[in-house]
Amino acid sequence: RDTDRSRGLGDVYKRQRIDRIDVSEDAEHVYVKVIDYKSGNKKFDLAALYYGLQLQLVVYMNAAMELESRKHPDKEIVPAALLYYHIDDPTIETPVELTDEQINEQILAKLRTNGVVNSDPEVVDRLDHYLQDKSAVIPVEKKKDGSFSARSGILSREEMQLVSAYVDAKIRDIGREILDGKIAANPYEKGNEEACTYCAYKKVCGFDGSIPGYEKRQLEDLDKQTLMQRMQETMEA
């Protein structure tokens, strides 16, 4: 389901078209899942989000939740999942013959969504009612004791709310900088990744690291706990 939303910030407006919104309802809640279709193998990166480099998916969720809250003012709107789906037609290569069921399982594994899911058991069950150990459709795995494995892409409801508020504040900061005329090239380096590698404007932006005074931002590779703590501190400042 597509939606088209505009949200204002003074004289700045964000206009976006969300690829897909799925909702599930009960008597008191509306659970919202947002999916962004990608031709490449996009991965959700909480650190990139913190640094303002990967805001789009959460912006979509914020818009979708606002839309649903207007439709259902008497219900609590719950973020269920923020997911990327890689549009692909995968092939399976194997040295041994597989059954049709085994082939389908491997294809599903290649097409599994990437992102973050609300860790609330009610939400996870609505997203994959047949989940036992490893989901074929969402980035969630369970250990033998029923807890989520470290490979799972999960956030608690409180963490999802914090991320939502942080991104909304980040967008407003970016909007103010645009209005203030701050448009200087400000590339970054994060581990082996750097902004200039695939930048479509690198031939015209004039940034040259060999010239004194031209330095890329050095971004730390932080763990989830530290990232959430820093987001919380930012929101409390």
Predicted segments with their positions:
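Short alpha-helix boundary/capping segments
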Residues: 45-55
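Short small-residue beta-strand/loop micro-motif enriched in glycine and branched aliphatics
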Residues: 41-46, 150
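Metal-dependent nuclease catalytic regions and adjoining charged, substrate-binding loops involved
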Residues: 63-198, 213-215, 219-237
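Conserved catalytic cores of phosphodiester-cleaving nucleases, focusing on short active-site segments
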Residues: 14-26, 31-43, 60, 199
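Cys/His-rich metal-chelating microdomains
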Residues: 202
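Single conserved hydrophobic/aromatic residue that forms the stacking wall/gate
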Residues: 2-13
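Short amphipathic alpha-helical face segments that pack within enzyme cores
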Residues: 55-63
